[in-house]
A protein has these predicted regions:
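N-terminal maturation segment of proteins
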Residues: 23, 28, 40-636
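C-terminal segment of classical bacterial N-terminal signal peptides
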Residues: 33-37
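N-terminal secretory signal peptides and thylakoid transit peptides that target proteins
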Residues: 10-30
Length: 636
């Protein structure tokens, strides 16, 4: 805390600094100039970390504004955390409006290039957040008939947070009514015609609310002796009814609920226990509801429609329509087909490329040996990158990760690997059936894993986590899968060009993933446009990529169960194509070296790739800038 305030005091400040001056650019410009002078000082010997890597010196006049916005939003999310709360919606609506007025009052023309980029990022983020808040409100209307009692639960916890005086007798009456209302809702469910997606959203909402409900009870039960006398029996009845109703909703929906984890690679020792105990209807084997692999079980959140897709693509700065993106995917598919036939012929299978894929899938390591394969493959990729001076890899990034096992339950949703702080590996477990164990081995064979490991670790997600935690951290509110997943897959494309895949088996393994990314665009957008059913998506993956059924079902289940936004699966290929086009523009032209380009790619932060392009090419930016980069030239 001392060092932070001390650092601020060293920046030369304008003599007259008032709110009008700041908003119109005077204060921000002067502060930016002061930051620039401070950073140009070369005699302080304070520009590098202990490992010799440069410290973050990314300056922007809007950096402080974004940092304040982020921490304020975090506080509001913490205070108004109850989903479905009217108070939460109203407070966020006011907050976004106030922030937008503040941003739009900035003197845009006085900003530096980085400041203008940050202006566009923050303004675009706020506009999208407002639209998302309105969309969330419409979703509330969908689930409201299923959980008409949720406001009673929300009201209890919000009153506690406002530190209102508790009346234990009144609480007992509320709990008694709550149990009755839940039973009535369960009875009404039998006549409900709502979609599986809506039923599942309601189930997930009850899981969330039950946590707050129990926290409310535990708080007063500990501190108020009268509370226990009045409410023990009533709470037990209401809590059990809430749990049973959540499980009933989830079972009726037939949706494989999103795992209650912490996102990519953020594994903790208690995660498996949490998943098993908190997911509605969680059991080792699914024994109720629609069969695994059925349309209802796979279709998850259901199709969102063209309007939602277009809004999401606009926010991600992708200037193509869903139909155009499917065309791009099919053109990339055609390239993959040609390369796959070439590799298949070299392996002796001629035009029967599926036999080549089958041969590769059967080249897997023995059970128990996957962890050592992953270790060796990660080291091979690092050596390749460093030998060719493609990117600067800080020493610590090679040291601060390890492997964890993907549990059998997790493999139902993600049958491959995930990465980040750790790499989670899908490998067979003794509790799985023989068929499941074989498909886990085949789906993560030596050649499929060769591309997966560096995608998840270095230079992929693990290195991304490391770098975004150290460079332009303030830009994290603008993170996008088109940067995260796109960059990781871009490395697969670049390493292919540079000869990392030498043998035909290695090329088949890499091509399966490339075809997979093409297929993700086709099947996910087609599903949301109601051109494909979930079962047809599974068959498409089996036919066009060569996946085993369990792996294809896991992929579809993961795509539509609500764990990821509707366009997330498009981000791998499209983001990679953006990075690839930018590499050709800057490295292919000789304007930057590979190392300089890739270092900058990480150090500018996790932002839309079009904004990274503006940061690197110095293009003039106007206040009303709209996405315009047609990065896929054959459709331009």
């Amino acid at each position: 805390m001392v060092s932070w305030f001390g650092a601020v005091l060293f920046y030369p400040m304008p003599q007259k600094l008032n709110r009008r001056n700041i908003l119109r650019g005077g204060g921000l410009t002067a502060l930016g100039a002061g930051l620039g002078r401070a950073q140009r000082t070369t005699d302080c010997n304070c520009a590098r970390a202990s490992d010799g890597s440069p410290l973050d010196t990314g300056a922007s006049e809007l950096r402080a504004m974004i940092e304040r916005y982020d921490v304020d939003l975090s506080d509001l999310d913490r205070v108004y955390s109850l989903p479905g709360s009217v108070a939460r919606h109203a407070r966020l609506e006011r907050f976004y409006s106030d922030q937008l007025h503040l941003v739009e009052a900035v003197n845009f023309d006085a900003l530096s290039q980085a400041g203008k980029i940050d202006y566009l990022l923050l303004r675009g983020h706020l506009l999208h957040s407002q639209k998302q808040l309105a969309a969330d409100s419409r979703k509330e209307e969908d689930i409201a008939p299923l959980i008409p009692f949720q406001r009673d639960i929300i009201g209890l916890e919000e009153a506690r947070r406002r530190m209102e005086t508790l009346d234990p007798q009144k609480s007992a009456l509320t709990l008694n009514k709550l149990a009755i209302d839940i039973e009535a809702a369960k009875t009404a469910l039998a006549n409900s015609k709502l979609t599986p997606a809506v039923l599942n959203r309601a189930a997930m909402r009850l899981v969330q609310l039950r946590r707050y409900f129990r926290a409310w009870f535990d708080f007063y039960h500990l501190y108020d002796p009268r509370f226990a006398w009045w409410t023990d029996a009533e709470f037990k009845r209401a809590d059990e009814a809430l749990d049973a109703y959540a499980k009933l909703l989830h079972t009726t929906s037939g949706v494989a609920g999103p795992l209650e984890g912490r996102g990519r690679g953020e594994f903790r020792d208690d995660d498996q226990e949490t998943v098993e105990k908190t997911a509605p209807g969680a059991t080792a084997e699914k024994t109720t509801g629609p069969p695994i692999g059925s349309e209802q079980e796979l279709s998850g959140i259901g199709p969102v429609g063209n309007e939602v897709l277009v809004e999401a693509l606009t926010a991600a700065m992708i200037p193509y329509s869903p139909d155009e993106l499917i065309k791009i995917a099919n053109r990339e598919f055609a390239w993959c087909d040609r390369e796959m036939l070439r590799a298949s012929t070299e392996m002796g299978f001629g035009n029967d490329w599926k036999k080549a894929v089958e041969a590769v899938k059967n080249k897997y390591v023995d059970p128990g040996q996957m962890i050592y394969l992953v270790r060796d493959l990660s080291r091979e990729a690092i050596e390749f990158l460093e030998k060719r001076e493609l990117v600067t890899i800080p020493p610590l990034v090679k040291e601060d990760y390890w492997e964890e096992a993907m549990t059998p339950r997790m493999q139902l949703v993600n049958p491959f690997f995930t990465g980040g702080e750790t790499i989670q590996v899908s490998s067979p477990a003794s509790s799985q059936t023989l068929q499941q164990r074989l498909e886990a081995l085949r789906g993560n064979n030596m050649f499929f894993a060769r591309a997966t490991v560096f995608h998840e670790l270095i230079p992929g997600h693990h290195m991304q986590f490391y770098m975004t935690g150290r460079y332009r951290v303030y830009r994290m509110p603008f993170n996008t899968p088109f940067w995260t997943e796109g960059m990781a897959f871009y490395w697969e494309m670049l390493l292919w060009d540079l000869g990392f895949t030498r043998t035909p088996e290695q090329r088949v393994g890499a091509l399966v993933w490339r075809m997979h990314r093409c297929a993700r665009i086709v099947f996910s957008l087609s599903f949301h446009l109601q051109k494909m059913t979930a079962v047809e998506c599974v068959q498409f993956l089996m036919d066009r990529v060569g996946f085993d059924r369990a792996n294809a079902e896991g992929e579809v289940r993961r795509s539509f169960n609500g764990s990821y936004p509707p366009i997330y699966q498009c981000a791998y290929m499209l983001g990679a194509l953006q990075f690839y086009a930018l590499h050709q523009e800057l490295v292919g032209s000789g304007k930057m070296s590979n190392r300089a380009f890739h270092d900058a790619m990480y150090r500018e932060g996790d932002i839309p790739v079009e904004m990274l392009r503006l940061a690197l090419n110095g293009q003039k930016i106007t206040r009303d800038y709209q996405t315009s980069w047609m990065f896929y030239k054959s459709l331009a």
